[in-house]
Structure formats: C-alpha cells, structure tokens
Amino acid sequence: MIKNISNLGDAALYCDFGSEVNKEINSKVIRYFKSIQKENIDGINNLTPSYNKLIISFDLRKKNFQTIKKLIENLNITNDDELETNRIKIPVCCDENFSLDIKRLEEKLQITRDKIYEKFFGKEFFCYMTGFIAGMPFLGDLENELQAKRLETPRVKVPKGSVGLTEQFANVYTLSLIHI
C-alpha cells in the first residue's frame, strides 16, 4: 500500500502512497493515520496526513527510523475497515462583493455565473486534508468544467470565509490571508 518510506530529516519519516490525488489513495493515507493513532506507539510525536503522503515525526530518544519503519510496515491495514466520515454543510454567500473571482471565472471557463453556481452547489465535496492555514479544508473532485488555474499574481489579501477554486480543489479560507 505504501510505495516508499524514507527519511525526512533525522526525526521523521515520509510515507509516499503515490503521486495521484484521488479518494482511493487518500483513504489509504487516512487508514494508516487512524491505525497509527489507535496503536498509540510510544515515541511517535506527530502524524501529518496529506492528499497522498503521511509524515510521521518521532522522538529519537525512544525510537529510530528503522524501528518506526518496521512498525509501519507490519501494521495490518485492510481496505475492509470502514472509514468514519461526517457530512458538513458550509454556508456560502455569493453576493457580488464576496465573489472576488466570479467575473474572471466566467471569462476563463466560458460559462455563466448561474452555471458556475449550479455546478458548484450541486455537488458534495470530499475533504482530502486540512492545512496550509489553520483548519483550511481542501475539498476535492471539483468538476472539470469549474477547474481554473491559480492566479499568476496572488491576491494581496484573501478575506476569512472566502472560497477559492484552484485546479481540482475548492478551499475555504478559515483565516484572512495577507501576502507581504
């Protein structure tokens, strides 16, 4: 299930599940994450899951890379284990003054504002991870028709609560972001 386990500095290891971003690979990452949490392995300090990677930080005074690697390789992880999920509704306001990129999206994607909203709100998203800024969900599997490239020059300020569409993800900014 894990394609490669390698050092990440002297007190962490990097579990690589592949380069694709999809639910199947992300589910493997989460299964390992949950299993390691459940095992409560002495010496493991922190687990950081992402789309398709898992970083495991450990205390060098208690365990070394080879010991942690062997523990991870010997975990009995199956796809049969049901992953617990929660459905969360996130209210979104699309008034003109909150829709920072709607005109750009209409032009780039060659579809109307109503069609953008219809496609966006007509879908349930899968949360691949939270991060970048505190608690920011990376909601995946955005319809191809809604996928847009990142801005060439990032906004100087992104207000808290903004929803960004970037490539295959929708992100909800949990904090205001100011680029300096």
Task: Please annotate each region the language model reported.
Residues 1-178:
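Glycine-rich active-site loops that engage anionic ligands at enzyme catalytic sites
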